[in-house]
């Protein structure tokens, strides 16, 4: 349970009562407005208390769990993604159109299944559709566009790489997920990553489904059969990202800063050059509103780099002609302009802005212009994130703790110390009420 309390000076005791046979439970205590989780898996409980205002608490937390390294500046621009480009030519053609139209773009993303006939996440490009990945990356770089690709911690056991992994006993039992808790498995994964993917000089890495997706680890022993999987399941994404980040810092051929997008996280993951996003979400207004509050909640956990799939991951079948959806997409995009990371993505969708008509394209262009005009501010604030333990996207309570009404603002937030962001979260609105928080310090 997390709770904000004011304590008088002196000694305070915390009493925790637990039973060996408790079942994992998550519930809301209406009387005290608390969310409570308890689990029989943990063998002990440790409490750490951070004192000070919100900024001081966050800085202390990062000092304890590790500072967030500086993001490359291009990671703070526009990242364009869709599910998915199917060929090398298709990806390059869309990148060229961005440049021809003068729509700002820093990074384009190749989602899953570029491995084709070689099997899931075989760490190879299927040359039938991607005949020359090295040339593909080179052409993107000539256009001053970076490339990110999707890489999983799941590997097809029938692939050449999967057979090697399986023969060495590097899988979590009865799954296709690599046992990153086993140092030998983690090192072998990185060895293949380094040899098969790093030579292409790809810029960013999308570690998808790092929960791991769909497979419970209960009754599955990990780390060479020495630990129960359910004990450390939630820590899995931390180990995956640690392996890749440390490898990139050691072996990247150009010595570049690492940028990793991971779907799942754990305390301290910010020290591995990661950003997270809210996963495969819907596209309706309620989903949009929930993403904002969810993102602000994530900011409050000390993980500073976050985004969502602007426009929603699952989209309506008539998305290109549906004007109601166009309005909604615009609101998603406008709001994401003031997120730590700005990214569009969509399931089975050609998400390029020109596919939605001139009006949507022009509004996207306008807000990208705003984003890039803000980039010196964003980059300066990102330095404060790294060196001072600051937070870029901030719930109002972080800056206006004396204003009780600020705590009730679910969707308004500060973007750095200077910008108050007020998303429009309902349809057919030409005006919108803004809450201006009280600041007793002027």
Predicted regions and their residues:
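Catalytic-domain carbohydrate-binding cleft regions of carbohydrate-active enzymes
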Residues: 1-442
